[in-house]
Regions:
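Phosphate/pyrophosphate-binding loops at sites that engage ATP/ADP/AMP, CoA/4′-phosphopantetheine
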Residues: 63-76
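Short strand-loop junctions, especially beta-strand C-caps/beta-turns
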Residues: 82-84
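Active-site-adjacent loop and "lid" segments of alpha/beta metabolic enzymes
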Residues: 2, 6-66, 86-181
Length: 181
């Protein structure tokens, strides 16, 4: 906080309740993540959900309400399905396939897709070869209305988001001259 941070990205889904209190007391933003009940720094196996998207919506919604109750400003709350945390590759793909349902909750959605295991397992690629898969996933999520992306490839991710928004008519080309002058 002293260094200027204004957002807490709680990747462990409220496991440490003091983070909510700190965010509320200081008017900070808060990212409500979903880990499927996984404890911090664990890597669960054979994770099962009746419906992973419904579970993410339910749990992040509850955490968002806890954040509001702790004093976090509603306009500073985001939800994050938290790909790879308490989820397998099939869950990650389902969350992307149905990310419009997350957007429909009304909470801004954050996704951290960069170089994730679900990308590597889907394409059978090591971490250093996951950029194309990451950018494809990002384009899909951006087209569905995901608001924020955490990325290792910032410039490329920005270009993908801008191009996706330009295709949908929600972003004006930065330098349109061909055939216009």
């Amino acid at each position: 906080i002293k260094a200027g941070a204004n957002l807490i990205n709680d990747t462990w889904a409220g496991h440490d309740p003091e983070l909510l209190e700190v965010a509320g007391a200081h008017g900070m933003g808060y990212v409500c993540s979903h880990t499927g009940g996984a404890l911090p720094r664990t890597n669960p196996v054979r994770v099962r959900y009746d419906d992973v998207v419904d579970d993410v919506i339910s749990e992040t919604g509850k955490l968002a309400q806890r954040a509001v109750d702790a004093g976090v400003p509603e306009d500073r709350i985001l939800i994050d399905p938290t790909h790879d945390f308490g989820k397998n590759t099939y869950h990650g793909l389902e969350l992307l396939r149905r990310c419009n349902e997350l957007v429909a909750t009304g909470w801004p959605v954050l996704m951290a897709l960069s170089n994730k295991d679900f990308v590597g397992e889907t394409l059978d690629r090591p971490v250093e070869q996951r950029v194309p898969g990451t950018l494809a996933a990002t384009a899909h999520a951006a087209a569905a209305g995901v608001a924020v992306f955490r990325s290792h490839q910032v410039s490329e991710t920005l270009d993908v988001c801008r191009m996706t928004l330009a295709i949908s008519g929600d972003f004006a080309p930065l330098h349109p001259v061909r055939g216009l002058v």
